[in-house]
């Protein structure tokens, strides 16, 4: 078997394992890959693969924290069904806060970051289900708030 074919099989197996949404640690992924014939896999290789494919830890149907692949790998757009993932938008006069469904904050933040300063966004910080958005100027907070509400079709 050619080296490229082995790598392709590894990637296929890796993605298939993550789709099962049952692996809570990198060590569990290493063990599963070893068991199906990929002996030269270690934690650092799995870590690089998780980063390469944009895998995130989120809660599965059993509410366990597991690794999974993102729904989309490209830069999300507002035409994506992302608005369904936003639960609440609020601000305190200085910073905007968005609450999302579990595991969705980083995806939403990535889309917001792609809008950038032209839309009044200086930067975002995302956790699992919460995003902080800093406006380009404190005086723009109300305008940014209204824009984000409109973007995700929420009412204030």
Swiss-Prot record:
<dbReference type="GO" id="GO:0034618">
    <property type="term" value="F:arginine binding"/>
</dbReference>
<comment type="pathway">
    <text>Amino-acid biosynthesis; L-arginine biosynthesis [regulation].</text>
</comment>
<keyword id="KW-0678">Repressor</keyword>
<dbReference type="InterPro" id="IPR020900">
    <property type="entry name" value="Arg_repress_DNA-bd"/>
</dbReference>
<keyword id="KW-0804">Transcription</keyword>
<comment type="function">
    <text>Regulates arginine biosynthesis genes.</text>
</comment>
<keyword id="KW-0055">Arginine biosynthesis</keyword>
<dbReference type="InterPro" id="IPR036251">
    <property type="entry name" value="Arg_repress_C_sf"/>
</dbReference>
<dbReference type="InterPro" id="IPR036388">
    <property type="entry name" value="WH-like_DNA-bd_sf"/>
</dbReference>
<protein>
    <recommendedName>
        <fullName>Arginine repressor</fullName>
    </recommendedName>
</protein>
<dbReference type="GO" id="GO:0003700">
    <property type="term" value="F:DNA-binding transcription factor activity"/>
</dbReference>
<dbReference type="GO" id="GO:1900079">
    <property type="term" value="P:regulation of arginine biosynthetic process"/>
</dbReference>
<keyword id="KW-0805">Transcription regulation</keyword>
<dbReference type="GO" id="GO:0003677">
    <property type="term" value="F:DNA binding"/>
</dbReference>
<dbReference type="InterPro" id="IPR036390">
    <property type="entry name" value="WH_DNA-bd_sf"/>
</dbReference>
<dbReference type="GO" id="GO:0005737">
    <property type="term" value="C:cytoplasm"/>
</dbReference>
<keyword id="KW-0028">Amino-acid biosynthesis</keyword>
<dbReference type="Pfam" id="PF01316">
    <property type="entry name" value="Arg_repressor"/>
</dbReference>
<comment type="similarity">
    <text>Belongs to the ArgR family.</text>
</comment>
<dbReference type="InterPro" id="IPR020899">
    <property type="entry name" value="Arg_repress_C"/>
</dbReference>
<dbReference type="GO" id="GO:0006526">
    <property type="term" value="P:L-arginine biosynthetic process"/>
</dbReference>
<dbReference type="Pfam" id="PF02863">
    <property type="entry name" value="Arg_repressor_C"/>
</dbReference>
<keyword id="KW-0238">DNA-binding</keyword>
<dbReference type="InterPro" id="IPR001669">
    <property type="entry name" value="Arg_repress"/>
</dbReference>
<dbReference type="GO" id="GO:0051259">
    <property type="term" value="P:protein complex oligomerization"/>
</dbReference>
<keyword id="KW-0963">Cytoplasm</keyword>
């Amino acid at each position: 078997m050619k080296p490229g074919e082995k790598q392709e099989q590894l990637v296929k197996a890796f993605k298939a394992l993550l789709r099962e949404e049952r692996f809570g640690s990198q060590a569990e992924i290493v063990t599963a890959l070893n068991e199906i014939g990929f002996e030269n896999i270690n934690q650092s290789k799995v870590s690089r693969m998780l980063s390469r494919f944009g895998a995130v830890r989120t809660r599965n149907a059993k509410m366990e924290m597991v690794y999974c692949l993102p729904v989309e790998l490209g830069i999300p757009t507002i035409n994506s069904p992302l608005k369904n993932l936003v639960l609440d938008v609020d601000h305190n006069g200085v910073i905007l806060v968005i609450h999302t469904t579990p595991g969705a904050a980083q995806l939403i933040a990535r889309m917001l970051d792609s809008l950038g300063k032209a839309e009044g966004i200086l930067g975002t910080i995302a956790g699992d289900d919460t995003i902080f958005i800093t406006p380009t100027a404190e005086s723009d907070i109300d305008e940014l708030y209204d824009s984000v509400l409109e973007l995700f079709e929420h009412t204030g």
